[in-house]
Amino acid sequence: AKNRPSTIVWCMGQTQHTIGNSMVRASCILQLALGNIGKSGGGANIFRGHDNVQGATDVGPNPDSLPGYYGLAAGSWKHYATVWGVDYEWIKGRYAPDMMEKSGTTVSRWVDAVLEKNDMVDQQTDVKGLFFWGHAPNSQTRGLDMKRAMDKLDLLVVVDPYPSATAAMAAMPSAEGQTVNKNRNVYLLPAATQFETCGTATASNRSIQWREKVIDPLFESVPDHVIMQAFADRLGFGEELSKNYKMLNSTFAGKQWREPQIE
């Protein structure tokens, strides 16, 4: 505490702990008490978790924002309608009128969106299908409720290099007195690992690093963008998904950056 300013740096172990919020608050309070906030070399700083999780967050998977942290206001949608080259009214037609500008369900509360009655959830119907893409609920609480919710779904899709805890939980026998939805479909789609594809990764400091492929994808696994493109093709907007990929083909630091290849 005598060497000031000093910083506290933590990773996912603290953030995703069952009392992670309290632990993060305690770190910030400690730094405030020591006078280390607002100074170069000080602060309470978090390192992101899995490979390229910062880049994944930047493109907008969070339920309360469009890509680039634009939020969900009408102006944000109009901005991205221009960026994507689609009509704003067409985008509106993809959503229920009262849902478009509301924050979605967080990853820790999806259980409630499945199990609660409609009047307790801020949406028209309960969640019927769920994708776990590169994510597993190992660090989340309410394991029994999570199992009940998985049993109630109509569709569960797990996209991961390995059968994750999500896939294992879906295959577990139901608790006594609980039944599995007889119409439920569960799919495990094998995604390639970070070593089996090339591309950019964004670090916690927002620096971008090019990553070369080490080996070809093993067995039936394919890179995430190939899986995403396959879904887009089947849903009828495959060309829209990849039409702007050419924007990534440029020269930087004397090197030609390759355009992603969609098969």
Summary of predicted features, one role per range:
Residues 1-29, 33-39, 46-262:
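Non-catalytic alpha/beta scaffold blocks inside enzyme catalytic domains
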